[in-house]
């Protein structure tokens, strides 16, 4: 039961090449033989699809099975996500009169007294009056969303995007 050690090494290399590249065993053997059994050279030749002479000329190099045909295009994916609207999953007609749908597309409130990036709410800083907070006068809201209008000028559109697609949310653009 004497097994040629070189033949055994070659068979192991062929099997490893098949697992790594995802190609057929006969193609792996041809690539390894052409690269003088240098594994990395044969693997590089396989992924670069260089012209290596084959004994069967009708045989084409196969695409590796463990890689996608085309990698994902992340800017396109971000563009698609920016086109999504929160109201679309609940209302088929797009934007409705609900405050939630309107606040998603309305400009943020402007607080002239704010000094930082966050506005301080106008809550009383002193202790509650006797009897508890139920006797406080209701404060008028600082900002009320405007009703939706078909000719709304918010969000502003870039000139080249005015007819093709809506502009992404500013927070989404900051992450790009």
Swiss-Prot record:
Q: Which stretches of sequence are listed as region Disordered?
A: 88-176
Among PANTHER family, the record links this protein to: UBA-LIKE DOMAIN-CONTAINING PROTEIN 1, UBA-LIKE DOMAIN-CONTAINING PROTEIN 2
Its protein name is UBA-like domain-containing protein 1
Q: Which family does it belong to?
A: Belongs to the UBALD family.
Q: Which InterPro entries match?
A: UBA-like_sf, UBA_8, UBALD1/2
- Regions of biased composition (Low complexity) lie at 88-105, 120-137
Q: Which residues form the signal peptide?
A: none
Query: What Pfam family is a match for this entry?
Result: UBA_8
Q: Specify residue ranges for compositional bias: Basic and acidic residues.
A: 166-176
Originating organism: Rattus norvegicus
Stretches with biased composition (Pro residues) = 138-150
Point out the gene that encodes the protein: Ubald1
